[in-house]
Design a protein with these regions (language model features):
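H-loop/switch region of ABC-family ATPase nucleotide-binding domains
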Residues: 32-33
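ABC ATPase "signature
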Residues: 56-57
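Helical segment within the ABC ATPase nucleotide-binding domain
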Residues: 11-24
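Short acidic-hydrophobic catalytic motif
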Residues: 60-64
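A short, surface-exposed alpha-helical micro-motif characterized by mixed small hydrophobic
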Residues: 38-40
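ABC-family nucleotide-binding domains
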Residues: 7
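Walker B catalytic motif
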Residues: 1-2
Length: 80
């Protein structure tokens, strides 16, 4: 996770740099708990639980219509 060990003041700067790189066409595989970042930048969101992929979808579908109960629970707890 690229922002997990950063001071809060640095998180936005790092995420903004990653957004710029993505917009310039760079391919990235990012593990993150920053759901706003994933929603904005990702082409695909993959959700894992206990080391298993339980859901994979476009950001629009992942956030608007999660299919797996574990994904629904996770999103309900962080998107309040």
């Amino acid at each position: 996770e690229p922002t997990s060990a950063l001071d809060p003041e640095m998180v936005k700067e790092v995420l903004d740099t990653m957004v710029t790189l993505a917009n310039d066409g760079m391919t990235m595989l990012v593990v993150t708990h920053e759901m706003g970042f994933a929603k904005e930048v990702a082409n695909r969101v993959v959700f894992m639980d206990a080391g298993q992929i339980i859901e994979s979808n476009t950001p629009a579908n992942f956030f608007a219509n999660p299919q797996h109960a574990r994904t629904q629970l996770f999103l309900s707890q962080i998107l309040r």
